[in-house]
Amino acid sequence: NFMARMKLFYLGPEGTFTHQAAMTAADQFATLGDFDLIALPDVPAIMQAVQSRQGWGVIAWENNVEGYVVPNLDALIDAPNAAGFARISVDVAFNAFTVRGHSIYDCTGNPVSAHPHGLAQCTRFIAEHHLQPEPASSNAAACRDLKPGRVALGPSICGELYDLDTLAEHVQDFDGAHTEFLVIAPRDVVQELNARAHSNDAGDFETIITFIPLVTGPGVLADLLDVLRDAGLNMTSFISRPIKGHDGTYSFIATLDAAPWEPRFRTALEEIAGHGDWAKTLAVYPRRERPNP
């Protein structure tokens, strides 16, 4: 009962890594309908569009060099009616661009712009050329708004999209960097998609869940982790975030190798609720292949 045409919102402008993830998602879910990819200026706008049922969204979640994209993590925790149902990995490689016809033979000392994560992933190139980092809302925006005499860092697709000259290729500090994205939808839609995947026996799932202990005192976190261990739930990631406006209170975000409909998971959640802890599922998606460290 999905629409023939659906909107898929991503962080614009065209040419962001999120745009690449959105194109991958549109291919992956082509059986559900045709997608119109729509660029929005920021993640709050994406969350708003998804929760008001205008379509689905794609948000950056975690980078294997920089870690979690914290504002997006907070946005999903705070969203009353959005959850993730697919996880998509995009390889992150940066080129350095200049305005066509204004080639910089020596870019030393010039301003360089990219998304803050982009600047953080190209520190060697920036230092080598003594460039002055200036953060932009996205790598693609840095490329789109590039002025003569300046440098922008972004995915190779930006060169074609914005008609730029490539000053240097693969200027990132680490090869093999990738960013993981979540495809998000209203919570009831995610439940329906998961029920469909579950009934098709689509294999194993992962769940991202946030816990907020409502009681404080020694051992609260240890008790929570004991429940997960005793249920045989394998945890692949665990981080804490302060709860805004409530000093000393934290939410704990765990990624688990299990689906919420598995009996051991349900039992663990009931026990955690019995301790007086609040839990909210942020995403459930088919398990990724992970290389052994």
What is each model feature region?
Residues 1-293:
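Domain-level signature for soluble enzymes in the chorismate/prephenate branch of the shikimate pathway
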